[in-house]
Amino acid sequence: MRIENLQNENRKYAKSIGNFHVLEYVQDASVSPMNAMNEYFMSKMNVRRRQVVIDIDKDHSAIIQAGSMQWMGGNVQATSGVKGIGDFLGKALKGAVTKETAVKPEYVGEGCLVLEPTYKYIILADVGKWGSAGMTIEDGMFLACDANVKSKVVARKNLSSAVLGSEGLFNLSLQGNGVAALESNVPEDELIEVILENDELKIDGNLAVCWSSNLEFTVERSTKTLVGSAVSGEGLVNVYRGTGRVLMCPVAPTTSLFESTNSMAAKAAAKSSNTFGK
């Protein structure tokens, strides 16, 4: 099988890592006179449709979020990845607590797999570079990964981080060697990468997109005393300790695409955060 014009003047690979590619539409050419102006300015502001393209062969199979496949070419088949009723129940529980689909199909064979288009921003992450413990991601970010990458649910180590941290009780952790495609509410170049070496990072609000799974995450007062916190007006902060990496979004909360890209909604969503709410 040969695809002649997957890339052209209007469709280009914006980023590639290994057998994963981000196909970006420079502009939406399928417009009417009613929406042409909106589509024009959307393109200028980098609001574009994007698709993940995955090359499948004997050395590379892929696991994707259920329902995200648009088309596939070549000798590519989907398998459920479910090994029995116990495995299905375990995956259903994992999906319920991480806002992901219960069963993520695995695609094997030889050919090309293309996922549904999205206006979200696609981050291609080399999971192996996050260390042996892997990376923990925000709920709902997972889109696809190499089959060599294993996923598991990690729980908060203490009650404070779960109840007060606005990050949920459980998150999805990815571990192994391979590429993961993540859906982000903001562009990758707006994210700040913080490298910790036996150090700590304090963040006011749910701004962390993903972090090394071996980092200790707690919620603490910004100062040592209640009086100090009250006077400073900072209150509680999310604290990441240890050695690893954190990707954070300093311009908007990570809760939804609408809240991240609409300034008024961002302020409303983060009204308890000094960064955006005041």
Functional labels for PLM-detected ranges:
Residues M1-K278:
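Composition-driven recognition of glycine/serine/threonine/acidic- and proline-rich low-complexity segments
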